[in-house]
Amino acid sequence: MPLCIPQVLLALFLSVLIAQGEGSRRRATQAHSTTQPALLRLSDHLLANYKKGVRPVRDWRKPTLVSIDVIMYAILNVDEKNQVLTTYIWYRQFWTDEFLQWTPEDFDNVTKLSIPTDSIWVPDILINEFVDVGKSPSIPYVYVHHQGEVQNYKPLQLVTACSLDIYNFPFDVQNCSLTFTSWLHTIQDINISLWRTPEEVRSDKSIFINQGEWELLGVFTKFQEFSIETSNSYAEMKFYVVIRRRPLFYAVSLLLPSIFLMVVDIVGFCLPPDSGERVSFKITLLLGYSVFLIIVSDTLPATAIGTPLIGVYFVVCMALLVISLAETIFIVQLVHKQDLQRPVPDWLRHLVLDRIAWLLCLGEQPMAHRPPATFQANKTDDCSAMGNHCSHVGSPQDLEKTSRSRDSPLPPPREASLAVRGLLQELSSIRHSLEKRDEMREVARDWLRVGYVLDRLLFRIYLLAVLAYSITLVTLWSIWHYS
């Protein structure tokens, strides 16, 4: 019995020492917990045993829903030749991480925390149309809410492929798609949804820089599933960026100069058709238009799969100028007939000076209907004229009597008759020359009348062709611009 009392006292003493040690450790722990910041304690609590290589769900059968959102900020470049669109967007991702949840009361009522992106699991959402790495700023943090919702906000410069249709340039509207999808996970693992409503996404232009060449019409969305293999389906969200080019600059620098040159070409028809200045004027105008096309060639978009309609317009305008020059050369050659040119045929005279002149309301064209002067008629007239003159001269005997009565030296009668005949032949030749000159002048006047009527006809046909072509293009461009 005396031996048991010391043992009991020793046991009590040891118990007191152990209790004091545990209390000291508890107080030290509480003091340390009170001095450590809540954010640091929360970060250590969340990332202590976190495995970022595992999809953050407690039930592996449950897919991770990733909600995405896109806000268009700027259209940086549209490369028609390489079919590349460069944009700048604000991209937002939302998903639930079941391993990043806590009770706010345990951590000084902290409801959200920013942690490094490299420390947690992030869905592998990529854009299928990527063709180059843009100069996007790096955002190394994400926001985590106490329910486990992760918010990943980052600006992106996207260099994506786009099928650009430049046929309607400069009144073209482009529709480029941005397809967001998981590169590895099927729809059973990662599903994609839209964070906002499609109407809100389509009409959101709150941060868009609207001072450039392109105008944002809207961003349309579409969700779909696609499968590479029959057993694997993938979720993807498409954003269709619809933009329209502002055509004012191109209308002023491309269309107006071409229109002015065509108007000057039409006004050039007011020059007289028998003037050689019209040909030189048309050639100068054609050379000026060629220089204009060389200058604007770098402004037009170039692709290997198509040509814009405005390029066809320039080619047709060049062809019209060439046709106008050819018509001018034809008319000038027609009204400048040479001396040996045949008279206007009767069928051409009737067709042009009667029918076409009446059709064009040019009034009645005077025509010279004169019978052709034949060599036989001229010969008869010459002989009769010579005969009459010879009858007045008389016979050689009369000439001899007259010479004797006057007592003056005269040439022999035969020589006098030959001189008179030579003089009459010279007069007849002069008369034939004058008649021939008048006939050639009349032929030239006839060809001038024909050329004038044909010039008016070709001018009106040319004017109708230019107006019809211009009205067609203006109508098409107006429909494309306001559709």
Curated annotation (Swiss-Prot):
GO CC, one annotated term: synapse
Organism: Rattus norvegicus
GO molecular function, one term: excitatory extracellular ligand-gated monoatomic ion channel activity
Main location as per UniProt: membrane
Subunit structure: Forms homopentameric as well as heteropentameric serotonin-activated cation-selective channel complexes with HTR3B or HTR3C or HTR3D or HTR3E. The homomeric complex is functional but exhibits low conductance with modified voltage dependence, and decreased agonist and antagonist affinity. Heteropentameric complexes display properties which resemble that of neuronal serotonin-activated channels in vivo. Interacts with RIC3.
Tissue localization of expression: Expressed in central and peripheral neurons.
Region described as HA-stretch: 419-455
Entry text on domains: The HA-stretch region of HTR3A seems to be responsible for the low conductance of HTR3A homomers compared to that of HTR3A/HTR3B heteromers.
Keywords assigned by UniProt, alphabetized: Cell membrane, Disulfide bond, Glycoprotein, Ion channel, Ion transport, Ligand-gated ion channel, Membrane, Postsynaptic cell membrane, Receptor, Signal, Synapse, Transmembrane, Transmembrane helix, Transport
Extracellular-side positions: 24-246, 298-307, 481-483
Membership in a protein family: Belongs to the ligand-gated ion channel (TC 1.A.9) family. 5-hydroxytryptamine receptor (TC 1.A.9.2) subfamily. HTR3A sub-subfamily.
Disulphide-bonded residues: 162-176
Protein task: Forms serotonin (5-hydroxytryptamine/5-HT3)-activated cation-selective channel complexes, which when activated cause fast, depolarizing responses in neurons.
Residues bearing carbohydrate: 109, 175, 191
Cytoplasmic side: 274-278, 327-460
Record's protein name: 5-hydroxytryptamine receptor 3A
Entry-linked Gene3D superfamilies: Neurotransmitter-gated ion-channel ligand-binding domain, Neurotransmitter-gated ion-channel transmembrane domain
Induction entry: By nerve growth factor in PC12 cells.
Annotated membrane topology: Multi-pass membrane protein
Record's compositionally biased regions (Basic and acidic residues): 398-407
Compartment(s) of residence: Postsynaptic cell membrane; Cell membrane
Gene Ontology biological process: behavioral response to ethanol; cellular response to growth factor stimulus; chemical synaptic transmission; inorganic cation transmembrane transport; monoatomic ion transmembrane transport; regulation of membrane potential; response to cocaine; response to ethanol
The encoding gene: Htr3a
CDD domains: LGIC_ECD_5-HT3A (cd19011), LGIC_TM_5-HT3 (cd19063)
Signal peptide coordinates: 1-23
Location of region: Disordered: 393-414
Record's catalysed reaction(s): Na(+)(in) = Na(+)(out); K(+)(in) = K(+)(out); Ca(2+)(in) = Ca(2+)(out); Mg(2+)(in) = Mg(2+)(out)
